[in-house]
Amino acid sequence: MRWFAKIDLMVRLLVLAILLASFLPAAGNAREIAQWISHGAIFVLFFLNGLRLPRDEVLQGMRHWRFLIPVLIWCFGAMALAGKGFAIVLVGSLPPLVALGFLYLGVMPSTVQSATAYSSLAGGKVSSSIVAAALTNIAGVFICAPMFAALAGSGAGEMGVDGLTKVFAILILPFAIGQLLQGRLSHWVRERKDLITWMDRISIAIAVYVAFSGAVEQGLWTMIGISEWAILLAATCVMLAFAFIGAWTVGGQLRLDRGDRIAFLFAGAHKSVAMGAPLAAVLFPPQVAGLVLLPLLVYHLLQLVISAPLASRLARPLRPVPDAAACSEPTTTARDR
């Protein structure tokens, strides 16, 4: 089991949550209790997010508009439209709610920890990465649900006004309170970093467990056969390639320096299950949330798989092009001999 211990801890918790939901799903009264626990954990999670996301750094980083505005446009514009396109194309090949999950994936903000960590490993500008991740997550709290509802149209019928009201009460309200109290309590958060990181992970795992419990009760594993899993995996790989290649290309077209271009790559291509799982748990009933979450969970796993070798490759120093003098030097030396 050593190989399992080497896997990212968040991925391990997600796998365990899915396995637990598959073999021991929360049903009946247990599901209602699990939902209340999940909503309470999500409220605390977004309160802590409000305390931690660096408002001052974001406000200062707003001056770097040439970097930040394209990140927002790519993350919530290009990726959202790509997700919409995938949802339309796949609706005949996958269960409708799973196909809709590609749109849900597209409107998610960037990750905070992993995008920043891989940007740092690749030699990118950490300051730009932190500001981009924080800004997309702050924006995501307010715009992900309305954008999904607008692009999904009738496909978002399960959401309704009640769903958006829950988003305000369970996500936006605690996040706003956390931002307001950031000056007073930020030191308390910093002193308990490990504990709060675990609270984050457990909250997300609970949300995934509740969502998948509902999906399993609806017959998830019989509803999606081997061919559908293959299509889901292939489509997610294509969307992942679009995200990474597109973000890198846009960074080049904007003539960003190498550090900013690397930060743009990871901030633009990564998608946050830390936002997606809690939001789905609030927006949808469990039997819907589990199916809608599938593309995001697969994407999240694949983005971690590809990011480690990619960061290592980008971290290698570029081989300098020898100038004319350097090229002529060995010839001169040989002739003198």
Residue ranges and their predicted role:
Residues A243, A247, R261, G276-A277, ...:
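Short amphipathic alpha-helical surface patches that serve as generic macromolecular interface elements
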